[in-house]
């Protein structure tokens, strides 16, 4: 189980990313349209003034049961060992153990 502070920090980053997503996207589009270098530098300054945690690259996918940040399966939103336990207990419909 991940510490609660780490999970809350990740939720805070998600909120910030959603809040500044449109500003970040419009600034990046504006950079590609502006021909002069001095205007581009001004827009880069605006991008740098945004909070660091609002960048989408700072987000991590976490297991929604344990909060584990590694070995997550996107389809289920679970970490590998929790996914395995749930499949063995037949708690995930449509997921079967492989046998050959």
UniProtKB/Swiss-Prot annotation:
Molecular function, one GO term: structural constituent of ribosome
Region (Disordered): 1-31
Subcellular location(s) of the protein: Plastid, Chloroplast
Pfam family, one: Ribosomal_S14
One GO-annotated biological process of the protein: translation
Broad class of where this protein is predominantly found: plastid
Keyword set, alphabetical order: Chloroplast, Plastid, Ribonucleoprotein, Ribosomal protein, RNA-binding, rRNA-binding
GO annotations of cellular component type: chloroplast; small ribosomal subunit
Subunit structure, interactors included: Part of the 30S ribosomal subunit.
Family: Belongs to the universal ribosomal protein uS14 family.
PANTHER family according to UniProt: 30S RIBOSOMAL PROTEIN S14 (PTHR19836), SMALL RIBOSOMAL SUBUNIT PROTEIN US14M (PTHR19836:SF19)
General function of this protein: Binds 16S rRNA, required for the assembly of 30S particles.
NCBIfam families: PRK08881.1
Protein name: Small ribosomal subunit protein uS14c
Protein species of origin: Solanum tuberosum (Potato)
